[in-house]
């Protein structure tokens, strides 16, 4: 029995020294397995007398139970330690800054369009849209552009078929609006337009904003005031100088082009658009009596305004999809 006590203490000490589950299982097999010394002691019970057998058997069972209990406790401790180690290695440090998602920006032409629309909407203008594929009537005839006018030539205009074109301006939207609405009319018509032209300052497709006012007693002074106020707000310069030069457009009479004072220009002035009083023939073609109503119209190149506002020298940069360029905005 002295051997039993020594074996028990030895087994318990080895259990306590086990550093992992594999080492712990080795101790279990070595002491409680089929060939283990504690198991072997049970096999000697048959050699004892009937009186000794229950006493010795009880002590052996007690020793085995002590070792087994120690094994269970150690196993639970090792399993808990393994779980904690795994959790520690897989934990997420919520104090770290998260990954930032890059936020895209609006295209400079879109920014410019939005800015123009916002300025005019703030003073009561409505935004009107129209088809980009137009018939000859709305793109030319209703705007007092005669059949022999060079703008109708194929080298200036994209023809879809004999009677339909990719609109060369947004003026057809003005005609359609006058056909469907009674004055007073205060609108702007932003959109894409198309012309056979491509160089540093021209592209086959570009954006235009045209404005139209039709009401009683509208004068050229109203037109000038509208354009000057718009340009000063757009460029955020209250002292911006604007000049008007006589010009010719089939759909307006009188007609003018307007420039702004610009230091980097060779002449000190830059053209930014055209304008004029709506021609009586255009009013009549749209069902508006020119004896009762007058109106003015103007047109602005959106890319030109964007180039000036953002300091871009080549119009084509807006449409080349160069991310290094576009990320500046």
Swiss-Prot record:
GO terms for cellular component: cytoplasm. Its main location: cytoplasm. The keyword Ligase applies. InterPro entries: aa-tRNA-synth_II (IPR006195), aa-tRNA-synth_II/BPL/LPL (IPR045864), Phe-tRNA-synth_IIc_asu (IPR004529), Phe-tRNA_ligase_II_N (IPR004188), Phe_tRNA_ligase_alpha1_bac (IPR022911), Phenylalanyl-tRNA_Synthase (IPR002319), tRNA-bd_arm (IPR010978). One of its GO terms (biological process) is phenylalanyl-tRNA aminoacylation. It catalyses: tRNA(Phe) + L-phenylalanine + ATP = L-phenylalanyl-tRNA(Phe) + AMP + diphosphate + H(+). Keywords: Aminoacyl-tRNA synthetase, ATP-binding, Cytoplasm, Ligase, Magnesium, Metal-binding, Nucleotide-binding, Protein biosynthesis. Binds 2 magnesium ions per tetramer. The keyword Metal-binding applies. One of its GO terms (molecular function) is tRNA binding. CDD domains: PheRS_alpha_core. Mg(2+) binds at residue 253. PROSITE patterns: AA_TRNA_LIGASE_II (PS50862). PANTHER family: PHENYLALANINE--TRNA LIGASE, MITOCHONDRIAL (PTHR11538:SF41), PHENYLALANYL-TRNA SYNTHETASE (PTHR11538). Belongs to the class-II aminoacyl-tRNA synthetase family. Phe-tRNA synthetase alpha subunit type 1 subfamily. Tetramer of two alpha and two beta subunits. This is Phenylalanine--tRNA ligase alpha subunit. It comes from Teredinibacter turnerae (strain ATCC 39867 / T7901).
